[in-house]
């Protein structure tokens, strides 16, 4: 009997030992599997918190470029700065930050640029800044922009002093500008983010887009690339302006048009980058002289022809504008508004009599 008890006890002990070993194996094995599972889950969580557009993408969309920007910046009125563009005034400063640039002739067949900015907050040097011509006021109004200039033609003064346009000029905010010693006057006048913002505050201008304002342009959506149906290749675009002789060259790798003028790259001296854009609009317009026989005026209402150039191709378009303070629409051959690729745009006003000087080639 005693022997049987010992046998039973031995068997029980063996069973217990086996059970303990099994539990340990299970415990260690489970722990190992749990660790792998946790790693997998951690990796999955990391991916879902960094990839989704709802968290990674800013909420705002730029009215100027169609690109994602901060919501605060997207609601901020742009400023439109008049840039001097004769050879004594270059290199330009700060213009690479602009989302839209207008180029148009003034007297003597030189051009001036009007650069529209949303994001200029860190710029200490913007310019050089030059005087206003009346038709530039209407360009600025199309974007609900605050217009910045230093000086003006006599034909623009009454308009600027009225409440028709919010503007920062030498007659109402001279302290917002400063002069440098690196070039001679009048080509050495500059402003800055601080100068612009302090002037806007002083003049008590509205800082957000007006109620109901809608984007001037329609832009491609994310990951969409507009490719024109036209067969006309546009790898080089000469604008036909006789003095600065500007042109753009298309880079297929990044889809950008890089700008040249005065025989060399058009550079922003604040970052040493060559100016470039995703879209070019050429608008043919009628121009006349004021009674003084030298000041230029442009007919911006009615309709006319032009070119839309993007992604290596060009197509003929028409433009329409019903009233001076209205919005210019650009239409394709089917009568639909053009859709632009996201990014910067240059809008170039060319007098009808010089339309044949515009050259678009392979």
Task: State where each predicted segment sits.
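N-terminal Sec-pathway targeting helices
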Residues: 2-16
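Hydrophobic single-pass membrane-insertion segments
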Residues: 23-36
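A surface/extracellular/periplasmic glyco- and lipid-processing/surface-interacting theme
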Residues: 2-4, 38-41, 46-102, 107-362
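ASCE RecA-like P-loop NTPase motor cores
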Residues: 19-21
